[in-house]
């Protein structure tokens, strides 16, 4: 009887994770399609250039802690608060160092390209807010991904509306570059 209860909880937990991903992918597809058409190849390429650096450095910024955190949360649920705090502090440090590294590389590679530097700087700030994703692993370990999914979905819905508003208002590429950072910032605020 206990096994079926656990399986049901695990299935619900997985369902929330899948639903969140599907929502995120559907919104991303629609909004990115509109954004790409609006920005054009040059500016959309610039945003993707910034995204490339950020994606590469994300592996350094996260420190590979996800599986370790899940295991630690399951092994020591009472110490979860300390674990979350320590992991967030570690990730804030590594994220800040990663963002600074990105800026140093881009400054060396793209000398004099002020727009490129600005877009990359705005986009790479998202690494700092990604440190708060650590809380999501705590929810996953407790089979309560519903709350983490709601937090990240609220953030992404807000950012999707923000991007559509930017399209309507005719804003430039800098405004789109910061949208990724706003996505993670809103999720971090909702998590806290």
Predicted regions and their residues:
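Hydrophobic transmembrane helix module of multi-pass membrane transport proteins
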Residues: 6, 54, 91-192
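Helix-terminus/linker motif at the lipid-water interface of multi-pass membrane proteins
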Residues: 26-43, 167-171
